[in-house]
Amino acid sequence: MQEVEVRIITNSNDIPPMEGSNVFHSRQLFCMYEQTPRIKPIMIVATNRGGTMVGHVLATLRYRWTWLPPFLYTHCRIYGEGCYDTQISDKDKEEVFGKMLATLTRAMSYRALYVEWSNLSNKLFGYRHFRTNGYFPVHWMSIHNSLHSMAPQERLSSKRIN
C-alpha cells in the first residue's frame, strides 16, 4: 500500500467529493448531524499521495446526560467499518482501516468517555488493529421472539384474559 495520509474533518465544507453508497458514512448524514443538537460529526478521511480518497469513516461524538449520578459525558459511535476505494485489495483496506482507527483513537482519547464500533460486516475485520489500539469486544445478547407461531389469545394465560 502506498503512503496514506489520514485527517479528521469536522466541517462539511472541508469534505472532499466521495464515492460509495453507504448512508452511514455519507456527506448527507454528516450534514444532518451538524444540524442536530448534542451531536458533533467527525469524518476520518484517508487519501493517497495523489490526493485520491481511499477510505472514509463517519463517527459521531454524542453528548449525554445522566440523572443518577448527575453528570455529562461524551461518547463516540461508529456504524460499520467505513467506505473504501473499490480498486484496493482487502489487505490494503484493512491497513487503511488500521491507520484511520489509530487516528480516531488518538483524537478521542481526551474527548470521549468511550468509542463504540458496531454493525461490522465481518466480525474479524480489523481485529488486529482493534486489539493494538486497546479495544475489546463486548458480546450483546440478542433476543428474537417469534409472534407468528401462536395466536395472541393462546399466548395469554387464563388470568390475563379475564
Where are these regions (language model features)?
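N-acyltransferase acceptor-side catalytic subdomain
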Residues: 1-162
